[in-house]
Amino acid sequence: MSQWSLSQLLSSLHEDIQQRLSVVRKTFGHPGTKGDASENVWIDMLDTYLPKRYQAAKAHVVDSLGNFSQQIDVVVFDRQYSPFIFTYENETIIPAESVYAVFEAKQTADAGLVAYAQEKVASVRRLHRTSLPIPHAGGTYPAKPLIPILGGLLTFESEWSPALGPSMDKALNANLTEGRLDIGCVAAHGHFFYDQASGAYSYTNENKPATAFLFKLIAQLQFSGTVPMIDVEAYGQWLTK
């Protein structure tokens, strides 16, 4: 009688992601098409394996003051408590309060891409976010503190050798403020994350990077808790303008 193998199941998850990214790299010649296909691989993985309270999409993020982020390759956002998500001509617009994490997704990591990803992440973190007191039977709970928005980078390969070595560390440490990248994956090599306790990046070279990254992301999202109660009327004021 055959038996299940958890090790094989976890390995298969990574192998599927790596194989799909590899096919994209080899098959599509147009950079734009290749980029879109790479984003779709990561979005599909997150939508499949993250708890259903989360959803992933390529999107812009907007705040109640009318400010927009740059276009973000992969946004992980709340779908359970978000009162509205705009979709117009296949473009998705997500309120800033609903965002848990944002990622830049490309085929290959290099210094330019890391800096570009940091600016993309900063464009989301700079947005204004509201948080309302929460009503209950006996009154109201204080407004929930805003959760940190995770920023990250998702690629198949790296221009550096070693892929997760000093060159990547230098690029990541160039921006540890609004643009800080908290977590990322180079699917052919390993994953990384920013360790708050040590104030430094941790790098892991491994055989199943996509799976390890997914588990680490889920763990970080668990610590994020739930997004705050959005002030819908702050957005509604734009109906009169």
Swiss-Prot record:
GO biological process, one term: defense response to virus
A single MF term (Gene Ontology): metal ion binding
Domain of life where this protein originates: Bacteria
Annotated site, Gate loop latch, chain positions: 136, 141
Site feature location: Binds cAAA: 53, 81, 226
CDD domains cross-referenced by the UniProt entry: NucC
Class of this enzyme: hydrolase
Notes on how activity is controlled: Activated by cAAA and to a lesser extent cAA; both cyclic nucleotides are products of its cognate CD-NTase. Cyclic nucleotide binding causes hexamerization.
Keyword GTP-binding recorded: no
InterPro entries given in the database record: DUF6602 (IPR046537)
Active site location: 73, 104, 106
Annotated keywords: Antiviral defense, Endonuclease, Hydrolase, Magnesium, Metal-binding, Nuclease, Nucleotide-binding
Record-listed E.C. numbers: 3.1.-.-
Residues annotated to bind Mg(2+): 73, 104
Pfam families (alphabetical): DUF6602 (PF20247)
Domain notes: Second messenger binding causes a series of shifts that enclose the cAAA molecule.
Role, per record: Effector DNase of a CBASS antivirus system. CBASS (cyclic oligonucleotide-based antiphage signaling system) provides immunity against bacteriophage. The CD-NTase protein synthesizes cyclic nucleotides in response to infection; these serve as specific second messenger signals. The signals activate a diverse range of effectors, leading to bacterial cell death and thus abortive phage infection. A type III-C(AAA) CBASS system.
Assembly and binders: Self-oligomerizes. Forms homotrimers; in the presence of cAAA the trimers associate face-to-face to form homohexamers. The 2 cAAA-binding sites are on the exterior of the hexamer at the three-way junction, there are maximally 2 cyclic nucleotides per hexamer.
Name by which UniProt lists this protein: Endodeoxyribonuclease NucC
Species, as recorded: Pseudomonas aeruginosa
